[in-house]
Structure formats: C-alpha cells, structure tokens
C-alpha cells in the first residue's frame, strides 16, 4: 500500500509516536510519501531517521490512504490537502481531544494491522464550500468543520443578514455566526451552544456567537440548501475563518455557503462508535453524583 503522511511540526515531546508509525509501515513494506514540511521537522529538528520513498508539497501527491498524526487540527489540514482526491484519511491522535483523529498511539500497531487486513470502515463526511469575490478566500474555500463569520478588532457587534435559498431568515446582531457541518458540530459550534449532530446527517447547523437577543437560537437546515450572508460592521470589515484559518473581508463582500460537491472519507475502526466517543471525549451525560 502507498501512504501519504501528514503531521504537526511542534510536538517534539511526542516524536516517539511518529517513529513508531514509520517503523510499523516499513515492517509491512509500505510505500511512504511524506509532507515535506513534516519530514524536515522529523529529520532536522528531531534527528529521526525515517524512511520516505517520496516527499511532496501542498496537494501534489497520490496514495491509497492518508495518515494524519497529531490532533484534530492536523487532521483538518490533511483534509484540506486531500480535497476532492477521494483518498481516505486515518487520524492518529497525539494531541488533546482527538475527535477526528481518534486512534490513540497505543492502538497504532493494531490499527495498521487492520488496515492491511481491510478490516475497517470508511465514513463519508460532508464539506462546506464558500463562494465570494474575495481572492484570498478563493485559495482555500472548503471546510470540513465550519465556516465562521466573526467581528474583527472591535468591541462592537456585527450585523449578519442571512438568507436561505434566497428567503430572508433573520439579521443576527452578534459577535459572529458559525455555519457547521455535522462533523463540525462538536467543534467551535458546540462551544457557543450549537447542537450535536450525528456525522451522517444531511444537515448544516447555523449558530450565532454571543447574539444580542434572547429570541435567537441555533437552527439546523438541509445541507442541499444555500446560505447567503451580508455583513455590516462599524469597522467596515470582518473575519472569515475556514476551519480555523482566517482572512479579513470588507463588509461589501457577499458570502454564499453551500455543500461542496465532494466529501472527505474518514477511516474508522469497527468498534469506534460516535456515541461512545461522545461519552469518553466530551464526557457526555457524565454525572459526578453517581
């Protein structure tokens, strides 16, 4: 099998996990391609002698499977690079939460064995696409988790006029607005009171950030509907954050958000169940009185 490896470049203390991964793949005779930036970090900064049959930049690669070793942020970066290639992504968690990257370092060896035995499942995760005339946002307009519209450099709220399929929904007076996929519903959206949505739902969550109203609540819509946003701000600009990567926009920029025409394939072990992950990672339903 041919693997493309992505990893973060700051977790020096957890370098042994990366070394273990490469040894496991080499043991199976895998063809290993490594993101050049990650390879440089391993070789130059950590002095690890890892096998790499090829190095690649940006999205200039092909593979049977992508492995992301790091946290959920590393997984999101890998997903951005994979784009519409249709390559499944396996996430190994060396970060904190690990909701997307949910294979622990202790499970690595067993998981790689399962990959070679074709004993795993692949989940299709929907992606959001942002359409606008801002050239900076056009470089990477896709989000696996969320697209967030936020105020910038001001204590004043922004006004976000929101339409669904051309029909006016409301004008949010708030610090921002989060448009999230089911995958992203357990990320930024959850932290501001958004709903938890099971990954396979064909829906999009719209959640305001600190709205100046008691009558505004999150809303869930069909994922084949189109969202149009017009923003007004006293500073005449605002932030757009796509899976955490942000750019400044002028308030004259109209934003259109819809489901992308491709999905991200996420590799899951058979016994990794979404509701189990909710309980163990998010402490869902935990009661200290019991």
UniProtKB/Swiss-Prot annotation:
This protein's cofactor list reads: a divalent metal cation
Which reaction is catalysed here? NAD(+) + ATP = ADP + NADP(+) + H(+)
Q: Where is it mainly found?
A: cytoplasm
Q: Which GO terms describe its cellular component?
A: cytoplasm
Pfam families registered for this protein in UniProt: NAD_kinase (PF01513), NAD_kinase_C (PF20143)
The record's family statement is: Belongs to the NAD kinase family.
According to its UniProt entry, the function of this protein is described as: Involved in the regulation of the intracellular balance of NAD and NADP, and is a key enzyme in the biosynthesis of NADP. Catalyzes specifically the phosphorylation on 2'-hydroxyl of the adenosine moiety of NAD to yield NADP.
Under which name does UniProt file this protein?
A: NAD kinase
Q: Which species is listed as the source? A: Bacteroides fragilis (strain YCH46)
């Amino acid at each position: 099998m041919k693997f493309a490896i992505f990893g973060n470049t700051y977790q020096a203390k957890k370098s042994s996990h990366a070394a273990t991964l490469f040894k496991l793949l080499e043991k199976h005779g895998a063809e290993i391609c490594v993101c050049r930036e990650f390879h440089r970090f391993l070789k130059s900064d950590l002095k690890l002698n890892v096998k790499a049959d090829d190095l690649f930049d940006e999205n200039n690669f092909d593979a049977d499977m992508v492995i992301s070793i790091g946290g959920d942020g590393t997984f999101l970066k890998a997903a951005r690079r994979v784009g519409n290639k249709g390559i499944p992504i396996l996430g190994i968690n060396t970060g904190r939460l690990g909701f997307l990257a949910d294979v622990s370092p202790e499970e690595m060896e067993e998981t790689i064995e399962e990959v070679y035995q074709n004993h795993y499942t692949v989940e299709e995760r929907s992606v959001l696409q942002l359409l606008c005339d801002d050239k900076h946002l056009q470089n990477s307009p896709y989000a696996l988790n969320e697209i967030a519209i936020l105020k910038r450099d001001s204590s004043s709220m922004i006004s976000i006029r929101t339409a669904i399929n051309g029909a006016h929904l409301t004008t949010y007076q708030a610090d921002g607005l989060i448009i999230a996929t089911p995958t992203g519903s357990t990320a930024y959206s959850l932290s501001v009171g958004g709903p938890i949505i099971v990954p396979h739902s064909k829906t999009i969550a719209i959640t305001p950030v600190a709205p100046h109203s008691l009558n505004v609540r999150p809303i869930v819509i069909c994922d084949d509907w189109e969202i149009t946003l017009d923003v007004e701000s006293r500073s005449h600009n605002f932030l757009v954050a796509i899976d955490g990567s942000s750019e400044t926009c002028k308030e004259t920029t109209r934003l259109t958000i819809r489901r992308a025409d491709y999905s991200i394939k996420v590799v899951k072990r058979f016994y990794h169940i979404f509701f189990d992950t909710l309980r163990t990672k998010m402490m869902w339903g935990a009661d200290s009185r019991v």
